[in-house]
């Protein structure tokens, strides 16, 4: 009878160990893949991330928004010319240089909205270069590798049935939460790029207002917002680097449950800090 009970116990332990290892493998693979994809996605420019979407946004901006920007620019140019005339006592004290000043300002404004996409893409080219350099410096691996899982399996095989059942239930819960976390990370990273596309689609309007003294803050704030979105990628890379250091500090061979929940906590911390990167970048660059 004792032999039969022992065989049943060993069989249950084998099933639980196998189930735990499957849960852990799926859990860490999901997070490893998602975190590993962050550096790849963040390091791309809007034109290379989703070329089809970028071309659509560019066509919409040039065919729909650009004419509106042209109307706004025409209104501003006429308004500034009137203001210049009034400021010189209705041409009573006429000086020709202010006409050349007006022509120069209008020419610069026209060039700005004509080269809107070149300017906006230059911002993201600069930020991409910064992100790629940061990726070269941040060498820490965020992955939980196969040897770590093998060590965990050896530890699990030496445990009692009750402990294995507890770990199995907790690993199932952590697996579900990790999938949710991976989805959140995916939304944050891809949401940033969607926000970039939305900002770029309206680019001609703030560029049309850039040269006007009274309304120039709109154009300046827009440019700061573009740089904030670009350098948000750098802050995301910093978060991933911190996550890599924290993950490597976890020892899975001693207390598996504590280590498992610690990884869970670090992953939640990563998602939270990724949420904050946009606000931090805008705060530093004083963008609204």
Predicted regions and their residues:
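Hydrophobic alpha-helical transmembrane segments
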Residues: 67-79, 196-199
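Extended serine/threonine-enriched, polar tracts that run as long, contiguous segments within proteins
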Residues: 182-189, 193-196, 200-239
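Gly/Ser-rich, low-complexity
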Residues: 1-72, 87-97, 107-177, 216-221, ...
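Elongated alpha-helical scaffolds
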Residues: 102-105
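Structural signal for the C-terminal ends of transmembrane alpha-helices
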Residues: 81-88, 210-215
């Amino acid at each position: 009878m004792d032999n039969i009970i022992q065989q049943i116990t060993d069989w249950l332990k084998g099933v639980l160990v196998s189930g735990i290892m499957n849960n852990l493998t799926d859990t860490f693979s999901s997070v490893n893949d998602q975190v590993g994809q962050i550096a790849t996605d963040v390091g791309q420019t809007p034109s290379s991330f989703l070329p089809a979407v970028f071309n659509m946004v560019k066509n919409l901006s040039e065919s729909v928004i650009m004419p509106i920007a042209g109307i706004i620019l025409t209104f501003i140019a006429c308004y500034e010319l009137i203001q210049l005339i009034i400021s010189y006592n209705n041409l009573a004290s006429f000086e020709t240089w202010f006409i050349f000043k007006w022509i120069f300002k209008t020419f610069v404004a026209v060039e700005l909205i004509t080269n809107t996409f070149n300017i906006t893409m230059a911002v993201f080219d600069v930020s991409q270069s910064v992100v790629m350099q940061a990726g070269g410096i941040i060498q820490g691996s965020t992955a939980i590798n196969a040897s770590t899982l093998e060590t965990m399996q050896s530890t699990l095989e030496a445990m009692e049935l009750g402990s294995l059942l507890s770990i199995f239930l907790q690993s199932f819960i952590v697996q579900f939460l990790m999938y949710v976390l991976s989805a959140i990370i995916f939304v944050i990273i891809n949401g940033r790029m969607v926000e970039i596309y939305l900002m770029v689609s309206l680019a001609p309007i703030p560029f049309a207002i850039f040269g006007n003294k009274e309304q120039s803050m709109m154009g300046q704030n827009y440019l700061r917002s573009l740089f904030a979105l670009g350098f948000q990628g750098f802050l995301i890379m910093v978060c991933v680097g911190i996550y890599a250091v924290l993950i490597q500090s976890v020892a899975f061979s001693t207390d598996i449950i504590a280590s498992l929940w610690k990884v869970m906590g670090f992953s939640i911390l990563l998602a939270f800090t990724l949420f904050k990167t946009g606000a931090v970048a805008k705060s530093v660059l004083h963008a609204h």
